[in-house]
Structure formats: C-alpha cells, structure tokens
A protein has these predicted regions:
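Non-catalytic alpha-helical coupling and interface elements of nucleotide-dependent molecular machines
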Residues: 25, 29-30, 50-58, 112-113, ...
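C-terminal engagement/docking regions of AAA+ P-loop ATPases
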Residues: 266-278, 289-347
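Conserved AAA+ ATPase core "coupling" helix
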Residues: 104-109, 190-249
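A general alpha-helix detector
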Residues: 6, 197, 244-248, 264-268, ...
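Conserved ASCE/P-loop NTPase catalytic core
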Residues: 1-208
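Conserved AAA+ ATPase small/helical "lid" subdomain
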Residues: 228-283
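Alpha-helix N-cap/helix-initiation sites
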Residues: 13, 210, 258-259, 275-281, ...
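Hydrophobic/basic alpha-helical segments enriched in Actinobacteria
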Residues: 56-57, 85, 89, 98, ...
Length: 347
C-alpha cells in the first residue's frame, strides 16, 4: 500500500483544503469540484484527505457499508430484511478512485461471471458505486468522463441509490457518496448537469512567489527521500486535524443558523441569478459546517462570506454583457450585500 502525502504538509491551496475539509464535516453539502492546471497538487490533496476521515459503523459482511442503525428502507436487500440488530464493525470512511477508462459495468456493477460459470447462479458483482457508499468517490479528469458514465453518476447522485437491471439481474442498493472531481479546464469542459451536482467548486493556481515554491520543493523532496519518516513527523498535526473534523461532525446539528444568514444567502443568490434553490441550501450548510469546524455555536455572516465563492462560482449563468470572471462577479455582489448587512447591524 502506497504512503500518501500528509494533508497538513500541503503548502498553500487554502481554498481547496478548506472545501475538502468542509465536505468531510458535512457530506450532505454535495461534493467538491477542483479545477486547475496540471501540477498544482489537486490529486495529492484529495488523496491525502483519506487519512483524516473518521471511522463509521457498518454491517459486518455487507458489500455496501450499510449503517446498522439506519432505517430498514434505506439499506440494501440483505440488510433490510427484518431481523435483530445486525453485527457491526468500524471502518474508515472509504475513498474510492473512479479511473477515467472505467467501463459502465465496473462503475455500477454487473453479473458475477465467475459465480455464473462455476456455480451456475446469477449473482451481482458490486461496482465502484457500491464501494463508495457512505464515503468519497474521486474522479480525476472528471471533465473527460465519457457521457454514459456521467449519465450513470447523475442518476445515482439524484436518487442516492444504484439500480442495475441487466442480464437477468435486478438489483437496487444504496449509493450515497461525496463526489470529488478534479480536472484541467483547458482539456475539456464539464457537462453543466454534472457541474451543478458539486456543492463546492475551487480554482487552484500555481504559486506565484519564490518562497512558496521553494518550500513545496523542500517538503516534497523530504517526503520522497523517506516517506515513513516524513509521515511520522507530521503525525501530530494530522491527528489534531482528524480530531477537529470528528468533533465538528458530532456538533454540526447543534450549530444555530440565524435568520439573517438565511436572508443574506437568499439575497445573494437572487442578485447573482442562480437557478433553483440549491445555491442557497448549499451556502447555508457550508457556512454551518465551517462554524462547526471552528468550534462556534452559531454560523455568522463571516462564515457565509467565506464560503460564498466556493458555493456559487460554478452556478452563475454566462452574461454576454459582463466579461468579468465568476469570482469577480461573486465578490462584487458580496461586497454590496455585506455592506448593507453592516449598515443594518448584521455581524
């Protein structure tokens, strides 16, 4: 098993690290889209997140990591049968890679050919979506995915379950995961339907100052020289951040959401002309998750403002009369609205 680079040793890229951490605190936010040029640490940072994720209880022997305490209707066919409380075990939240060249059978699952040939029985071979249930599904170069794979992801993302009907099989199982995608926008555009499914979006850039670049090189060389020793050196910081994420997850439901926060989120999305209400809902949830991560009892306008660019930049319609970037448009409206909030006595 390869040794991953420590998350806390990554220099800069604060927006990306914050977005991934927020998604770990509240998986319901809807995933993270990371776009940027090659060599900016996108894949390294995303894979480093796996070591920070807490453990969850799963039904022993279940191929879908079903929650032993969840209501029966939300479980797989085997775990959903009436019975006593099933045996359970603890496991780290899974992070599953979806390779670019994966077939649809590998992604959604298919007939278990070996069992069919050896035993003459029709059995389902779970795919990557099953492995990612209650965890993270990572797609590198997500903007280059084939259309039929994108369609499968969209169907599952909308329903939270995977339905496979083929080769005489009819299988339905839970498939709720945090979708994390990375890619270089210069190599191809992401389909709007899939882009809208990401709760947060981050643009990463190559560091433009010499000290930062030197520090990145120094740390990377130290890691490549002795990976075990390097991880041991950063173990304390990794452990501290892991505990911080776990505490935030535990306290998330207790974080208050003031009325002014809801009103400001609605005004912001209305002013930017975002479609539907997904923007407001995600903005409020991410502000609350950030407050929980900071150990606060209530989300404030400061948290809302901090998360607004990541939540809204990929939801804007293209305006032929405004050539400004999405970030500039979001920041412009934020500045106007938050000045109003200050004048009205908001915090």
């Amino acid at each position: 098993m390869s040794i991953a680079y420590p998350f806390t040793a990554i220099v800069g890229q604060d927006d990306m690290k914050r977005a991934l951490t927020i998604a770990a605190v509240d998986p319901g936010i809807g995933g993270v889209l990371v776009l940027g040029e090659r060599g900016t640490g996108k894949s390294t940072t995303i894979r480093a997140l796996a070591a920070l994720l807490p453990k969850i209880d799963v039904v022993s022997g279940c191929s879908y990591q079903c929650d032993p305490l969840a209501p029966r209707p939300g479980l797989c066919a085997q775990c959903g049968k009436p019975a006593d409380t099933p045996d359970s075990k603890a496991m780290t939240i899974p992070v599953v890679d979806l390779p670019l060249g994966s077939t649809e059978d590998r992604v959604v699952g298919a007939l278990d050919i070996e069992r069919a040939l050896v035993n003459g029985e029709k059995a389902f071979q779970p795919g990557l979506l099953a492995q990612a249930n209650r965890g993270f599904l990572y797609v590198d170069e997500v903007n280059l995915l084939e259309d039929h794979i994108v369609d499968a992801l969209l169907d599952v993302a909308a329903s939270g379950e995977n339905v496979v009907e083929r080769e005489g099989l009819s299988v339905r199982h839970p498939a709720q995961f945090v979708l994390v995608g990375s890619g270089n926008p210069e190599e191809g555009e992401l389909r709007p339907q899939l882009q809208d499914r990401f709760g947060l979006s981050v643009d990463v850039r190559t560091p433009g100052d010499v000290p930062t670049r030197v520090e990145i090189i120094r740390l990377r060389e130290a890691f490549d020289h002795d990976r075990t020793a390097f991880r041991k050196k950063w173990a304390r910081k990794e452990s501290a951040l892991r505990r911080k994420i776990q505490v935030a997850r535990d306290q998330l439901d207790d974080v208050d959401t003031p009325a002014v926060l809801l009103e400001t989120a609605a005004k912001l999305c209305l002013a930017l002309g975002t479609d539907g209400l997904r923007g407001e809902l995600t903005l409020v949830r991410s502000a609350r998750a950030l407050a929980a991560l900071e150990g606060k009892s209530a989300a404030t306008l400061k948290h809302l403002r901090a998360m607004a660019p990541s939540v809204l930049r990929h939801r804007l319609r293209r305006d032929p009369l405004d050539e400004s970037s999405a970030d500039i448009r979001v920041e412009r409206v934020i500045a106007e609205l938050f000045q109003e909030s200050v004048n009205d006595g908001g915090n």
